[in-house]
Regions:
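Glycine-biased, small-residue-rich flexible motifs in mid-sequence functional cores and linkers
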Residues: 2, 8, 13-296
């Protein structure tokens, strides 16, 4: 009703099809538990993803824009593994950790969800135009900002409360002190949403905030496998149709690069498929990242 009070009387109002209100059945109920729930959500992309978000069947990933190479690699790897395991990956489409998480999810043919601090008709940063379009094609874009609305610095911090409310777990990959990612972690703790942290270089400024979370009951995340084992398969998990061919291609042992040449599949897809087979006890990863079938 707040949307209607802002935009006109009910008999004259026609709400656009891409605008969600709290009266819609697919409105994510987790948003209503917020102190400041959004008036509306503007969405672009796959509407079916909203059903999973409504049940908080997604994993949020946050971190600094000025990430280290290690942080970027971990974010992309986590996004890839979670996407391959069927988990929608929720982040903010910002520079650094956010973008790496989305790219990893896309590499595994997963479902990325971007909660923007800008209206949907704005791209920030501008060089993320192609990435934003790809996320919309394969997943979902969400924003509480009206089209044409001017962008304020506080909008980016405000969207943190939304991505936490759509997720069943939060991963902080890397962030300094006084980072927006720490706001997300605090909100997650208030909502009893588990917080996982990738341990970072103790001497690097960009890891000080995330490392400090490990002193406050956040769980250390040492590998994506741990998180997938804890969560299980996600809501959009697909049966691994390539499993027999993949196990056969391993032979006595093969790297992902060798499997790429043999099976002509992207590295992200192979990594997520191999992790699924590892969790099922069918393959094992040995030193040197050599994958081998498990002996009967």
């Amino acid at each position: 009703m707040r949307y209607r009070r802002l935009h006109g009387s009910i008999p004259q109002l026609k709400i656009p099809s891409n605008v969600l209100t709290p009266l819609d059945q697919i409105w994510p109920q987790g948003l209503d538990k917020l102190d400041r729930p959004p008036l509306v959500l503007h969405q672009q992309g796959r509407a079916d993803v909203l059903a999973w978000l409504g049940q908080r069947r997604a994993v949020a990933m946050v971190g600094t824009r000025a990430a280290s190479d290690h942080g970027l690699r971990m974010a992309e790897h986590l996004g890839c593994v979670l996407g391959g395991a069927g988990w929608p990956v929720v982040s903010g489409l910002a520079e650094g950790i956010d973008a790496a998480a989305h790219r990893g999810c896309l590499a595994a043919d997963g479902v990325p969800v971007a909660v923007l601090g800008t209206p949907l008709d704005r791209v920030y940063p501008r060089h993320h135009q192609a990435l934003q379009e790809e996320v919309a094609r394969n997943g979902l874009l969400l924003s509480e900002r009206q089209p044409g609305e001017s962008v304020q610095p506080g909008h980016f911090a405000a969207r943190n409360r939304l991505l936490v409310s759509l997720s069943c777990a939060l991963v902080v990959v890397e962030c300094p002190d006084r980072s927006g990612a720490l706001i997300s972690a605090r909100l997650a703790a208030e909502q009893q949403c588990p917080v996982w942290v990738v341990p970072g270089d103790a001497g690097r400024w960009s890891s000080r905030g995330s490392n400090r979370l490990l002193q406050n009951a956040a769980a250390p995340l040492l590998s994506p496998k741990e998180l997938v084992e804890h969560l299980g398969p996600g809501p959009c998990h697909k049966a691994n149709a390539t499993a027999p061919a993949l196990v056969k291609a391993l032979g006595a042992g093969a790297s992902i690069e060798q499997l790429q040449q043999t099976l002509k599949l992207p590295a992200g897809r192979l990594a997520s498929d191999l992790l699924e087979l590892e969790l099922a006890g069918q393959v094992v990863c040995e030193s040197g990242f050599l994958w081998k079938p498990c002996r009967p």
